[in-house]
Amino acid sequence: EEDKAALANWRERTGQKEAEAITKAASSRGSQMHNYLESYLLGRENLSFFEDNEQYKKMAKEIIDKGLTNRLEEIWGTECTLYYPEKYAGTADCVGVYEGKETIIDFKQSNKPKKIEYIDSWLLQTAAYSLAHNIVYNSHIDACVILVCTVDNLFQEFKIKGPELITYQNLFLGRLKKFHELSNLNQTLI
């Protein structure tokens, strides 16, 4: 709810038309960056594809150079559809071994630098993916990494692992339980 209120306040301060243009540009840039990163991870592209001067390619290169090179040891999958039986589903950007740990890896673009206290929704999302992967594939994912690049080419890395990851998994499961309770309540009222 706080995220929705903050977004509504931003839209009001910025103006609907300008906010829509910023949102559309960020979404397009993020999709293009994700596509390049996926192609790179699948071996479909080499670094020469960065010779072009487009911003999303520069951002992808920052993530590759500072977040993936010599750190991502195994790729188990890209754009992995994951599900927790009868509960939820989603798509993880990358799953593999990162710095020696079974890891969910998520790529994000941002218009400005992030602080960890502002990315709870991202952390909850990756925690949910780790739960789903562990249940369905009997894996032991014990880390989630979010690799971010801003439009100014500032690279950021956010990690949760061990007890902190378990905390986010439990927070996600709590939200999921509330969602299902509200859904059941709404069904009863209909």
In which residue ranges do the predicted regions lie?
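Mg2+/Mn2+-dependent nuclease catalytic core
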Residues: 76-185
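Metal-dependent nuclease catalytic cores that hydrolyze phosphodiester bonds in DNA/RNA
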Residues: 1-89
